[in-house]
Amino acid sequence: QGEIIGIIENSGAGKSTFARCLCGLDKKAKGMLEMDGASYDAKQRRHISYMVMQDVNHQLFTEDVLDELLLSMDGEDEKADTARAKEILNSLDLLDKVKLHPMSLSGGEKQRVAIGSAIASGKKILIFDEPTSGLDYRHMLEVSDNLNRLKELGKSLFLITHDPELIYKCCTYLLFIQGSKVLWHRPMDGEAVSLLRAFFSHAQEAGAVNASW
């Protein structure tokens, strides 16, 4: 709880399957998640987790941006929900888009709307699949700031990412998947930074990512 866990992998190593199991969307998932002294099976995890997909076009459903965030909220207090949704949109530089149809936005703007919906949901576990894909550096920083605020609120965040700058800005723990298995996991310390540098240097040489140090 109150952690941002970065999940990195060699391409096709199973991170998306891992994410689907974590949030209870994979029917083959059999394990239990233990958190705060409680255990959650796959069905229970669906009620406490929210996943933002890499292709956010599959999870934008409403007629305008504001309603997209309201859709993920409990709806008990419409006035309070609307105020909170606008606050989130403002933090994501989207307040001027509230009445626009989500599908009319750019790819980066759609990504931020989906992230806003995750924030608005209030779920304990938030899973983001490449949340900065298509975003410029300024908006990456805004996403990072929002993720850090969620961490401070006690949320558990999982970031599937190949963005080293995002990892350095907000991750507190790292998990590396290779061959559909967890090869190593550790806090974001000096050893983790060394392992990250080696991973991204190799990936950059292979042309898989663009990394700056």
What positions do the PLM features span?
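Helix-to-loop junction immediately C-terminal to a conserved catalytic motif
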Residues: C23
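Conserved ABC ATPase "signature" region
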Residues: A80-K97
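Conserved ABC ATPase signature
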Residues: H101-L105, E109
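Catalytic Walker B motif of ABC-type/P-loop ATPase nucleotide-binding domains
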Residues: L126-D129
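H-loop/switch region of ABC-family ATPase nucleotide-binding domains
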Residues: T161-H162
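A short, surface-exposed alpha-helical micro-motif characterized by mixed small hydrophobic
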Residues: I167-K169
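Conserved beta-strand-loop-alpha-helix hinge in the C-terminal portion
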Residues: K181-Q204
